[in-house]
């Protein structure tokens, strides 16, 4: 019964920060329930590799895009491309983080 309730067949779900720890789990859950995870992160190679993994395991049509969530122009261009390619966006998982405290902590020895 729960499986039927949570099915995402035919749904296009965009996931920012898709190759991080939680992003990967979100993408796998979307794919597992029949949705199409659209993977956004900072490295094209990494999102492509992850999309290929999801496609092989779950038989979905996942794709990835290199996107910097702090770049508004990139985001607008990506949305236009996604609408052109898929005709819609059904959901968004805002998983990417832009936390200067995290960046600063990397500099501390």
Model-derived regions, located:
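Rossmann-fold scaffold of SDR-type NAD(P)-dependent oxidoreductases
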Residues: 16, 89-97
